[in-house]
Amino acid sequence: MSLKIKFLLLLVLYHHVDSASIVKFLPGFEGPLPFELETGYIGIGEDENVQFFYYFIKSENNPKEDPLLIWLNGGPGCSCLGGIIFENGPVGLKFEVFNGSAPSLFSTTYSWTKMANIIFLDQPVGSGFSYSKTPIDKTGDISEVKRTHEFLQKWLSRHPQYFSNPLYVVGDSYSGMIVPALVQEISQGNYICCEPPINLQGYMLGNPVTYMDFEQNFRIPYAYGMGLISDEIYEPMKRICNGNYYNVDPSNTQCLKLTEEYHKCTAKINIHHILTPDCDVTNVTSPDCYYYPYHLIECWANDESVREALHIEKGSKGKWARCNRTIPYNHDIVSSIPYHMNNSISGYRSLIYSGDHDIAVPFLATQAWIRSLNYSPIHNWRPWMINNQIAGYTRAYSNKMTFATIKGGGHTAEYRPNETFIMFQRWISGQPL
């Protein structure tokens, strides 16, 4: 066989392997997808036993020049497919009673892929369709930061056309512990090794877990401000508990009694959006439950035709779960505040936003740790508008950090996807909110 024929054969084989990860049709969606979707695995570690699964969706605008985002869901252990379907992707799930076939999908109007390329990553290992070839060892915040950095380096080496695109690391909820540390890791990696460097520009976080012990204490003043507890509960709590409402000293019996009263008042409040009907998110199989779509996404992702369409490795995964709560995990980053500070010193842009009806990570807590950074505000607290209506409030700081609230928003973008999209669109374009 001539050298030329061998080369052509290798070229055809390479093209076949590459095109095998391109997804043009999805069960439940009528016709070909109106966007470019690639799925695949990247091995992590020396032996590549950890296999991170990703969805890559090209920008619908100008993929060659638009920003590249890497999106991480929270949990830890929640699949990025939830981000695609419920928060900021180009397809969503129709609210229909499950009939045994793959649930139906529809095109969204609020996808961030309208002006950005996005890598949606299933991490840590064990979440979504990511898996390990060997039994999963206990992982944690720090090890996942390093693994995700390795993933990004390898992904870019396979997609070198995106090296020059501005990179932003984005996520929400528990990824508030991972994203700032990952930004620092990428930044330091650019100095230590690797040519060309990753074109890191900044990061974006929604209702981020940042310092859990600190943040939980703000649930009580938030509940009081929203009228969930009375003066008779709040004023003594403030005085007797000294601002420490969690991990209460067992000898402080008065504080313990008051916290019991608080829990009685809020036990049936949906912590992710206080105006949303409460139902058990671990049992969402009833169509009457607000979170019934969480059941539908599990039905969809566990459909064999869906797995074939997404090119899921056969035998790599049992039942897909929206959030895998069984992953052995060390919460070894206590606070991500120092990472925010270091990233600001390095000159990276950041947008921190809060749905103002979230009590899990109240906007009061996020404002408090931002204040602790002691950065000068560029402008005073002001409303930001959509169609001449207030969509939230914002303040920008001298360290390139912007804080914004989303009026009526909850713990994730799914509660106000259109407003979150417009906020993202303005910020990523360098416009004031």
Curated annotation (Swiss-Prot):
The keyword ATP-binding does not apply. Disulfide bonds join C78-C323, C241-C255, C279-C289. Changing K268E: 25% reduction of activity. Keywords: Acyltransferase, Disulfide bond, Glycoprotein, Signal, Transferase, Vacuole. The keyword Nucleus does not apply. It is an enzyme of class 2 (transferase). Glycans are attached at N99, N283, N324, N342, N418. GO terms for cellular component: secretory vesicle; vacuole. Belongs to the peptidase S10 family. This is Serine carboxypeptidase-like 8. The lineage of its organism: Eukaryota, Viridiplantae, Streptophyta, Embryophyta, Tracheophyta.
